[in-house]
């Protein structure tokens, strides 16, 4: 069979039309050094700061140093098997973590992979770990409370949804306990919680998970873990990953609470990475951008407007405002709040809860110092009944602490001073609270009403705890409707005042 030139030409054209060229270009380079989780790469061009770099065995590094001829990157995980001369390439993407409702009740690592031994997690998408904070126009004022369940905090240092409130104090003063109790108190409120453990011992993290399970609060919580045994790169990344997970709920018009435990260890991990990258050290050997490290993280916590939620969901969700409330924790050394990292975070946040070792050791739990603890925006969000009943508590405590210091130098005190000291001691005793026992708004209101209206005058200090426990039981048994009404509305009026007086009078007459 002979083909003529026309048929040959047609056949060649068909083959050319069907020919597919599998041609793909990569921005590729090679590793020139590996040490302590830091790799130096030569040959990469057009690299973005924070870009993911693909390593052999489908592992990744993040570009943190971009120099004239080389790129410095930090490996996300083990680096033992990485060798010099290995080929790497740019991905053109920044790091993203999986997010979704299915992460609630689970323990994940800084990259969003489950580490609790349960099934894999079906995610609802991916969010970038580094994201811009909402602008001024997109924000809404903080005017809704978030209840911690602690009398001393909800009455004197109230926290609002969308606020950033620092918990600061020496080691072993109850910082984590306060944060965990706040999570436990949210199980009825519908607020989604994220607990980020940075540089903690695994035994401590296991204990936190166990306590949340025991108090039926784990179902509402995501735990992000970068333990002390993990690479500094993962400890650096963990808070940003946790914040991305919180932003998923905020963007749906829901309220979320995120706890960073703690940012001191986060700063140390970043210092380690920066020194290994040969960045110039500054004060306390921290790099120059240590303030920006925490400010860009904490500025993402805010309350956003309905328009923002509507815009970000492309009109799928309307009429809802979302929020991220951040409770960063900072550990001080011997009560020194003027150190570099504590002063940075104090200046970024909207207030601080200061926990003192001497108060903790003297049996006052939570060991909050009301004198230097402050909430800059939370008072606007405080429940009406708590706001009205707590106005005199801070003043009474401040006067008591001043007089207590003065009375050490004088044995001869007049009756007025003695009464003030006695009243202050009783209020201090009344504000004590055990761990894992948060109380409701109505219970707080009743206790504050007792303190504010001098119903403790005829009760000795050693019986205050018993009095508090029994009056709350009495209130739930005989005034259940009143307590439920206060929990729902948070209002305070003459009717509620009269019922409180009747309740306390009846209890003291018949039961105590």
Swiss-Prot record:
Cystine residue pairs: none
Reaction(s) the record says it catalyses: ATP + H2O + 4 H(+)(in) = ADP + phosphate + 5 H(+)(out)
EC number, as in UniProt: 7.1.2.2
Residues given in the record as ATP binding sites: 169-176
Tagged with keyword Signal: no
GO molecular function ontology, one term from the record: proton-transporting ATP synthase activity, rotational mechanism
Topology class, membrane: Peripheral membrane protein
Site features described as Required for activity, chain residue numbers: 373
Role description: Produces ATP from ADP in the presence of a proton gradient across the membrane. The alpha chain is a regulatory subunit.
Cross-referenced HAMAP family: ATP_synth_alpha_bact (MF_01346)
Assembly mode: F-type ATPases have 2 components, CF(1) - the catalytic core - and CF(0) - the membrane proton channel. CF(1) has five subunits: alpha(3), beta(3), gamma(1), delta(1), epsilon(1). CF(0) has three main subunits: a(1), b(2) and c(9-12). The alpha and beta chains form an alternating ring which encloses part of the gamma chain. CF(1) is attached to CF(0) by a central stalk formed by the gamma and epsilon chains, while a peripheral stalk is formed by the delta and b chains.
Protein name: ATP synthase subunit alpha
């Amino acid at each position: 069979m002979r083909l003529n030139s026309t048929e040959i030409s047609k056949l060649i054209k068909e083959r050319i039309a069907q020919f597919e060229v599998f041609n793909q270009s990569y921005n590729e380079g090679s590793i020139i050094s590996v040490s302590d989780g830091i790799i130096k790469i030569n040959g990469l061009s057009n690299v973005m700061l924070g870009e993911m770099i693909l390593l052999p065995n489908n592992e990744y590094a993040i570009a943190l140093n971009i120099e004239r001829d080389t790129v410095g990157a930090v490996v996300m995980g083990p680096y033992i098997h990485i060798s010099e001369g290995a080929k790497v390439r740019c991905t053109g993407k920044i790091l993203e973590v999986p997010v979704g409702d299915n992460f609630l009740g689970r323990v994940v690592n800084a990259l969003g992979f489950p580490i609790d031994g349960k099934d894999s997690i079906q995610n609802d998408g991916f969010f970038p770990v580094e994201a811009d904070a909402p602008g001024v126009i997109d924000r809404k004022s903080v005017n809704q409370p978030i209840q911690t369940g602690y009398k001393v905090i909800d009455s004197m240092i109230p926290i609002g949804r969308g606020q950033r409130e620092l918990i600061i104090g020496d080691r072993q003063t109850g910082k984590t306990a306060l944060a965990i109790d706040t999570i436990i108190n949210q199980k009825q409120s519908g607020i989604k919680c994220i607990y980020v453990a940075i540089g903690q011992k695994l035994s401590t993290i296991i204990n936190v998970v166990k306590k949340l399970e025991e108090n039926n609060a784990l179902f509402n919580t995501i735990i992000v873990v970068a333990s002390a045994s993990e690479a500094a790169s993962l400890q650096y990344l963990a808070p940003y990953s946790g914040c991305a997970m919180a932003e998923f709920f905020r963007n749906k018009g829901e309220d979320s609470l995120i706890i960073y435990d703690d940012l001191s260890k986060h700063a140390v991990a970043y210092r380690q990475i920066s020194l290994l990258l040969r960045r110039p050290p500054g004060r306390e050997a921290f790099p120059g951008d240590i303030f920006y490290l925490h400010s860009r993280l904490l500025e993402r916590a805010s309350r956003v407007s309905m328009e923002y939620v509507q815009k970000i969901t492309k009109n799928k969700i309307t009429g809802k405002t979302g929020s991220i409330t951040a409770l960063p924790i900072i550990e001080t050394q011997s009560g020194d709040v003027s150190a570099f990292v504590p002063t940075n975070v104090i200046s970024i946040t909207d207030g601080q809860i200061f926990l003192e070792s001497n108060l903790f050791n003297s049996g006052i739990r939570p060991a909050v110092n009301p004198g230097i603890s402050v909430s800059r925006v939370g008072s606007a969000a405080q429940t009406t009944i708590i706001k009205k009943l707590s106005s005199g508590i801070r003043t009474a405590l401040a006067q008591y602490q001043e007089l207590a210091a003065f009375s050490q130098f004088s044995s001869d005190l007049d009756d007025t001073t003695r009464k003030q000291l006695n009243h202050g001691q009783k209020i201090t005793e009344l504000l004590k609270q055990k761990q894992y026992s948060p109380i409701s708004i109505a219970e707080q209101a009743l206790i504050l009403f007792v303190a504010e209206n001098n119903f403790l005058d005829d009760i000795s200090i050693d019986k205050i705890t018993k009095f508090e426990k029994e009056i709350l039981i009495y209130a739930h048994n005989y005034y259940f409707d009143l307590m439920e009404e206060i929990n729902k509305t948070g209002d305070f009026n003459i009717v509620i005042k009269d019922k409180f007086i009747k309740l306390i009078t009846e209890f003291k007459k018949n039961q105590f």
